[in-house]
Amino acid sequence: MSDFQKSFSESTSSIKFDEKYIDNSVQPNDIGVADQWAVKTVDDPCVGNLATPVNSGYFTKAFINNLPFYREGISPNFRGLETGAAFGYLLYGPFTMTGPLRNSEFAVTAGLLSAIGAVHIMTALLVLYNAPGKAPNVQPPDATVNNPPKDLFTRAGWADFTSGFWLGGCGGAVFAWLLVGTLHLDTLMPIIKNIWTAG
């Protein structure tokens, strides 16, 4: 304890307030509008995690807790499969439409191979996160996620998530490739390619 703190803790004199600054109409149990929306610490104020109307709101909590990474009752492998499928599916379009081969006849196949390559790179990063010598970082409960999945943040759980991510990512890219190859999209592909043509 510093000398500055000691002077306050050892002081025997009572604190006196100036009467003109005291509002007698406010009672200790009154909750004002500002107090209802005040930012409060979640657990430990030193961590810096605050419960704000954004991260602890109903919509945000419902949205985040329904993502496959935090949804309750599914295995780590299925979490990875669902997350990877979304990544692979969403990566295929930008690689196909804006890739260097976008104006060639190989654009569809090049987009597929690029998306699968990106999924492989992300899978390698997930494997490195679970490298020997360190355990996965266990997320504590916070204002948005009250109950993070315990089975995911183990070595075996993270390995299952990674294998599911690889399979889902490759499958999602192949599914997008199959959709682009349908007859319905053959008429739309030249229009979409001309929108993003840069040269």
Swiss-Prot record:
Keyword Nucleus: no
InterPro entries: PSI_PsaL, PSI_PsaL_sf, PSI_suXI
Record GO cellular component, one term: plasma membrane-derived thylakoid membrane
Membrane topology reported for the UniProt record: Multi-pass membrane protein
PANTHER family in UniProt: PHOTOSYSTEM I REACTION CENTER SUBUNIT XI, CHLOROPLASTIC (PTHR34803:SF2)
Family: Belongs to the PsaL family.
Name this polypeptide is given: Photosystem I reaction center subunit XI
